[in-house]
């Protein structure tokens, strides 16, 4: 093995130069992992995980022994001064800090605390060639005997005390993205990804059906749930939380103050309700909330972290609110209720969509802010424009503790490679600015869906540990794809170089976007197509990680190419030409054919996967209704992420209707005028392009719902066996269609 220096520079990290190297012949079959005599649950949990990874790498059993065992030929001792008599205190006292030192026959990994021991162990494994990604791991071959030139001397600590993720399970849809359809194995992979990447914080949405059924046993239907049986969902949550805590991940419960489901509301018909919220001027709100939160904490345990989402009072965009108290007064009620339930509560409130600093000026000093960087101004108006937030802290008093949350997805019809505020360079600038503020305690990702962009997740995990202004796509490519790094970069480098997305809109309200015909937009599309062709040449010799990345890239370029052809055909029609939409149709059809080959991207396949677990709520119609509403039709169709069903039943149908509209108008010697759009967001370099955006004809909504409900009903009632992996087949003609000529501007009726 080549000598590696293994110096990891982190914010607030003290890295000491490596000692002079000395060659050792290491027999990987004699590798042992050594735990302290008083090892914590966290230390033992990650040692068990590391043993499995090392066994995969070495092809041999790896012993896990106590430090009282006789010394071996190659021992890796992991612990803290509290857990092991052989581990000395390290210089850094920061939680999560670690020190790695020594060489075979003994490497010692010392943590400032148990989390630090965990972090040091996985950092050591990365030095040996392991890499940990959301969708799988890179496991090196450590076989037989090897000459190892390695002596380690490293100490590092994280820039942010809390580093992590938010896994949101509000939507139903493709299994890859929607935690609502995850089983225990899916959750375990997500939590292991976090632990292995030295993350320690998770915003978690606790299921409340079982809790509410316990508090309100007379309420009808709470024992069933909307998709899973309440008991089953509750049991899964308990397992997930226990596993997270065993891996050193603290969980913050996200809670709404005032919201209760209909069966509970029915018990109190004489109280004043508004859109599911109990109006806060009534003392019953605090009483019912405290009962609910008390049972929640008793049933699921707590790490004393809570995010209060208060949507029942004034100035809320999601509902017609109660206005009997101010929003600040409602929050103060929630704080008081939570502190009675948990006197050690660490309460947070999001800045997202709020008026700051006004709201926070009324809060106690111990309430933390979670500053959600959203990336679009006037987000709830008809047209969001440009950038909303600056880097670093929000406009809050300097003594207010806060955490930085990165909202990395906003377009359900985007393919999660580009969004409005989250290319790597943008994230890095904010991380550096946030780390420089001593009041900032944490840095985490809010991906809205889960397991979305592997690249951005990797960037955020690294930035949370050690902010840098220049995340390296090249280094990421080498770590993830090894010898196939250059083909990967051929496809992704032009897209990532382009930076933040310039346009987004809700997927079922798809728009015609002439900006995609601008020269710069066409240049990006042309470069990405060339890169995709390069990636295609290597698919047969690639890993599942490479195939996933290719499908993501292919999806981005197909979506962009189809929209480009649509815009060009329509503008040609406006100019009086007879046009065809065949290039757009061929592109959509090719994309549909690819997405159908990836089961975890299908909405119907997600329903099958849930049904296979055998814990569906009673009544297929109710579950079918939940999948339709929360997977396809909730909030103006917003959750409809890119899936084969979306292409087949929405996007192709919209194209057919556009073509019919245009051809009929042309035969009459007229121009088919399209409506001006509803909501969309843009960051066009020339704002005049926004005036040319138009609304495409809507799909046949009745047919879409009918077909989807029928497919969901069948999937839920007769779940098939899990799909088997198969080789991806492609039609390269998509990448060979002649692109339109660029346009400098567009004027539409």
Predicted regions and their residues:
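Catalytic-core regions of glycoside hydrolase
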Residues: 55, 60-63, 72, 141-143, ...
């Amino acid at each position: 093995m080549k000598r590696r220096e293994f110096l990891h520079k982190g914010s607030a990290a003290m890295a000491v130069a490596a000692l002079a190297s000395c060659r050792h012949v290491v027999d990987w079959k004699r590798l042992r992992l050594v735990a302290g005599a008083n090892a914590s649950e966290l230390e033992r949990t990650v040692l068990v995980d590391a043993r499995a990874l090392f066994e995969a790498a070495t092809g041999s059993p790896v012993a896990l022994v106590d430090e009282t065992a006789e010394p071996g030929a190659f021992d890796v001792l992991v612990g803290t001064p509290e857990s092991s008599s052989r581990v000395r205190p390290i210089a850094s006292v920061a939680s999560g800090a670690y020190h790695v030192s020594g060489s075979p026959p003994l490497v010692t990994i010392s943590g400032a605390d148990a989390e630090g021991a965990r972090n040091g162990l996985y950092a050591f494994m990365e030095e040996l060639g392991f890499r940990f990604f959301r969708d799988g791991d890179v496991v090196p071959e450590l076989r037989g005997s090897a000459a190892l030139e390695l002596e380690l001397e490293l100490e590092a600590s994280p820039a942010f005390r809390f580093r992590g993720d938010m896994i949101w399970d509000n939507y139903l849809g493709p299994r890859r993205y929607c935690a609502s359809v995850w089983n225990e194995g899916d959750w375990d992979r997500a939590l292991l990804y976090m632990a292995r990447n030295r993350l320690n914080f998770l915003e978690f949405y606790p299921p409340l059906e079982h809790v509410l059924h316990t508090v309100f046993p007379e309420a009808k239907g709470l024992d069933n749930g909307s998709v899973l049986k309440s008991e089953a969902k509750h049991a899964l949550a308990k397992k997930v939380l226990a596993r997270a805590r065993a891996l050193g991940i603290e969980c913050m419960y996200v809670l709404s103050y005032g919201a209760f489901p209909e069966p509970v509301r029915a018990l109190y018909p004489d109280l004043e309700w508004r859109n599911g919220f109990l109006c806060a001027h009534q003392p019953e709100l605090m009483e019912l909330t405290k009962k609910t939160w008390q049972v929640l904490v008793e049933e699921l345990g707590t790490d004393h972290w809570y995010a209060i989402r208060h949507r029942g009072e004034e100035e809320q965009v999601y509902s017609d609110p109660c206005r009997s108290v101010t929003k600040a007064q409602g929050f103060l009620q929630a704080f008081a209720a939570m502190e009675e339930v948990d006197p050690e509560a660490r309460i947070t409130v999001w800045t997202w969509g709020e008026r700051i600093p006004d709201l926070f000026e009324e809060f106690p000093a111990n309430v933390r802010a979670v500053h959600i960087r959203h990336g679009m101004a006037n987000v709830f108006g008809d047209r969001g424009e440009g950038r909303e937030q600056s880097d670093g802290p929000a406009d809050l008093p300097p003594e207010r503790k806060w955490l930085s949350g990165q909202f990395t997805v906003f377009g359900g019809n985007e393919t999660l490679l580009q969004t409005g505020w989250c290319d790597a360079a943008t994230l890095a600038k904010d991380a550096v600015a946030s780390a420089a503020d001593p009041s900032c305690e944490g840095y985490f990702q809010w991906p809205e869906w889960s397991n979305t962009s592997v690249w951005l997740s990797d960037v955020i995990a690294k930035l949370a540990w050690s902010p840098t202004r220049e995340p390296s796509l090249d280094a990421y490519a080498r770590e993830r794809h090894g010898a196939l790094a250059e083909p990967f970069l051929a496809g992704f480098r032009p897209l990532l170089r382009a930076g933040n997305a310039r346009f987004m809109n809700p997927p079922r309200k798809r728009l015609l976007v002439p900006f995609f015909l601008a020269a710069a937009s066409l240049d990006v599309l042309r470069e990405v197509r060339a890169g995709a062709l390069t990636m295609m040449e290597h698919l047969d010799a690639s890993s599942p990680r490479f195939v996933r990345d290719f499908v993501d890239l292919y999806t981005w370029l197909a979506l962009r190419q189809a929209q480009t052809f649509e815009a060009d055909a329509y503008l040609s029609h406006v100019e009086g030409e007879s046009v065809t939409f065949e290039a757009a149709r061929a592109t959509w059809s090719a994309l549909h054919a690819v997405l159908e080959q990836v089961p975890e991207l299908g909405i119907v396949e997600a329903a099958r996967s849930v049904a296979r677990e055998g814990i569906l709520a009673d009544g297929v119609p109710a579950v079918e209704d939940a999948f339709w509403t929360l997977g396809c039709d909730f909030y103006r169709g917003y959750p409809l992420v890119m899936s084969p069903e979306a292409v087949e039943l929405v996007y192709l149908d919209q194209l057919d209707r556009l073509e019919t509209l245009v051809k009929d108008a042309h035969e009459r010697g007229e121009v088919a005028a399209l409506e001006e759009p509803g909501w969309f967001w843009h960051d066009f370099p020339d704002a005049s392009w926004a005036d040319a955006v138009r609304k495409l004809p809507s799909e046949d909504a009745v047919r879409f719902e009918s077909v989807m409900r029928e497919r969901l009903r069948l999937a839920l009632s007769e779940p098939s066996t899990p799909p088997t992996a198969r080789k991806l087949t492609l039609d390269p003609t998509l990448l060979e269609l002649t692109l339109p000529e660029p346009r400098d501007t567009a004027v539409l009726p």
